[in-house]
């Protein structure tokens, strides 16, 4: 089991699947690892498909296997992870969000769920409602989560997502006020997102002027959230072409994200490379570097990734990415040293 878990942690999903299969081959009897291995294979297969373009039939097969698992082992608190995976498949891979919503509603009603699990399911359902173009119901759920979790990351994340909904809707000053509160969140990821969004609005908001471009950017990001890429890309090109540098550069970052989501990594890398050299905004340059380094890691161009992380640490030490970049740089160095030792 440890071999499988180590492989998962290293994103070596093929090796993890093989290790899980060896556990399953031993059968159910006197095999305490049987259920974790059944779950692990489903999760690994899903993660494998997410790494590159996949056929709908592949996702249907995983969904069918998840359904089979639930029929065999029941809708119980111990199987919430597979229920959650199945809802994600229906919502975002199989274009059946109504089925996902019904499944999450059923999951939320399972007796004896612990409070954290219940909150995570409600958060997943609120995300789905946002995706289904129902921001009002999503906001209600996020507000409930925020009140039920006033001093933990679940509550902070709900507040962040509620602020993003306000940003999408063009309520810029209210959204910024929420982002400002979240700058001190205990989760570095939430804090970083809040800092960046607050800074973006602050730098581009015109108190006495026209904020239509900023509002267009928010609406376009909502389309990006809903994975409507055919509509998103021309809108981003329009914003890049005619907006001020603050919005144009930010739109370029979002275009790179869109291209990555469509598995057009080479085009995304080219955009990010140009942006890091062109932009005069430090936070934009830092984010472009961080995104580009992540792409280089994905493409196994590890020396280039390491150099980009080094630049973030040395030249952008005040950015929200510097600490994470230092950690990733050390990880890459450790990997190189391991290879040398194995020669």
Q: Model regions: which residues?
A:
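Acidic, polar-rich low-complexity tracts and alpha-helical solenoid repeat scaffolds
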Residues: 1-343
């Amino acid at each position: 089991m440890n071999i499988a878990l180590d492989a998962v942690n290293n994103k070596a999903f093929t090796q993890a699947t093989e290790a899980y299969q060896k556990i399953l081959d031993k059968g159910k009897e006197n095999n305490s690892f049987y259920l974790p291995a059944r779950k692990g294979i489903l999760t690994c297969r899903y993660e494998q498909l997410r790494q590159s373009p996949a056929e709908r039939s592949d996702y249907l097969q995983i969904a069918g296997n998840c359904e089979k698992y639930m029929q065999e082992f029941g809708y119980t608190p111990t199987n919430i992870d597979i229920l959650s995976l199945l809802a994600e498949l229906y919502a975002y891979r199989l274009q059946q969000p109504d089925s996902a919503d019904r499944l999450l509603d059923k999951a939320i009603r399972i007796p004896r769920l612990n409070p954290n699990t219940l909150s995570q399911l409600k958060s997943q359902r609120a995300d789905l409602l946002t995706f289904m173009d129902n921001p009002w119901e999503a906001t209600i759920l996020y507000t409930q989560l925020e009140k039920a979790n006033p001093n933990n990351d679940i509550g902070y994340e709900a507040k962040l997502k509620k602020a993003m909904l306000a940003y999408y809707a063009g309520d810029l000053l209210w959204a910024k006020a929420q982002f400002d509160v979240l700058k001190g969140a205990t989760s570095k990821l939430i804090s970083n997102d809040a800092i960046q969004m607050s800074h973006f609005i602050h730098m581009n908001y015109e108190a006495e002027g026209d904020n239509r471009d900023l509002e267009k950017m928010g609406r376009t990001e909502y389309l990006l959230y809903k994975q409507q890429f055919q509509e998103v890309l021309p809108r981003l090109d329009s914003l890049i072409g005619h907006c001020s540098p603050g919005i144009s550069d930010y739109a370029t970052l979002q275009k790179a994200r869109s291209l990555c989501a469509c598995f057009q990594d080479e085009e995304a890398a080219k955009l990010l490379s140009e942006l890091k050299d062109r932009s005069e905004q430090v936070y934009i340059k830092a984010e472009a570097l961080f995104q580009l380094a992540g792409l280089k890691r994905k493409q196994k161009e590890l020396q280039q990734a390491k150099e980009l992380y080094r630049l973030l640490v040395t030249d952008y030490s005040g950015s929200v990415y510097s600490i994470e970049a230092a950690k990733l740089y050390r990880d890459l160095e450790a990997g190189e040293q391991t290879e040398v030792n194995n020669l």
